[in-house]
């Protein structure tokens, strides 16, 4: 890539001869980038998308031995991937993201899910879920609002369904409801959640914000998508990563 006079940035601790090194991915938030490459697991990929403002395509390389649900390749495949990128023999996989807001403050976007749970573990909270003109009220430990990308994550571990990544829907999954309440699949429109106790608002298991009791937490589709570089089309990509 450097031989082709491509300008390359690396984020510490990665170091490549001829590349400009920055200390944190946030230093590239507004940079005009054509491509990003992440080395690590899904957490690294989620963090990268959260910090970059523009819809920059990302090639996710799984390093570390975990499943890498979001990744496209492993390190031994990197030369093949670069060749396909240079020859434009790739396709872009666009995924919806979600963002939460409370009291006129927008929180960082999430690719997988937003998890709202009770702060006080000694009391069961009453959660009110509003969508369009309907309301569901239930005592439970929390609520997950997941995207199709996140349908193989926390929501799935609680019995939620797996969805194809290209769908524009949200999955609302209750966490330990007192009375059994199934996951609810809704169009990607505004969802409002209110709890009668103070709550945590957790984005992709990485960023935690808080809300007071009776605050309205609004979750909606984020204005910008996450864009993945794919070397080949795969109809059930996420399910195959889970071993199905």
Language-model segments: which ranges?
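Short glycine-rich anion-binding loops that position phosphate/pyrophosphate groups of nucleotides
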Residues: 41-44, 64, 149-152
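Short Gly/Thr/Asp-enriched flexible loops that form oxyanion-binding sites at enzyme active sites
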Residues: 46-54, 155-159
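Catalytic phosphate-donor-binding core of small-molecule kinases
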Residues: 2-27, 64-143, 152-244
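Proline-centered loop/turn at the N-terminus of a beta-strand
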Residues: 57-59
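Generic structural signal for beta-strand residues in well-ordered domains
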Residues: 1, 29-30, 51
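A general structural motif
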Residues: 3-5, 33, 55
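Short, well-ordered secondary-structure micro-motifs within conserved domains or adaptor modules
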Residues: 26-47
């Amino acid at each position: 890539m450097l031989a082709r006079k491509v300008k390359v940035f690396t984020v510490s601790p990665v170091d490549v001869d001829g590349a400009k090194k920055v200390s944190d991915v946030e230093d590239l938030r507004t940079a005009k980038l054509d491509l990003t490459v992440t080395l690590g697991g899904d957490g690294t990929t989620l963090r990268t998308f959260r910090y970059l403002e523009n819809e920059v395509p990302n090639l996710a390389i799984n390093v570390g031995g975990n499943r890498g649900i979001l990744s496209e390749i492993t390190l031994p495949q990197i030369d093949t991937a670069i060749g396909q990128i240079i020859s434009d023999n790739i396709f872009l996989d666009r995924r919806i993201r979600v963002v939460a807001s409370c009291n006129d403050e927008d929180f960082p976007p999430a690719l997988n899910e937003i998890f709202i749970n009770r702060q006080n573990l000694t009391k069961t909270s009453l959660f009110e879920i509003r969508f369009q003109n309907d309301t569901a009220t239930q005592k439970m430990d929390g609520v997950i609002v997941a995207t199709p990308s996140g349908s193989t994550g926390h929501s799935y571990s609680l019995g939620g369904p797996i969805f194809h990544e290209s769908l524009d829907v949200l999955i609302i999954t209750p966490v330990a409801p007192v009375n059994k309440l199934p996951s609810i699949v809704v169009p990607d429109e505004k969802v409002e959640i209110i709890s009668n106790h103070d709550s945590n608002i957790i984005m992709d298991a990485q960023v935690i914000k808080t809300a007071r009791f009776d605050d309205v937490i609004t979750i909606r589709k984020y204005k910008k998508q996450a864009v993945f570089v794919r070397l080949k089309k795969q109809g059930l990509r996420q399910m195959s990563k889970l071993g199905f």
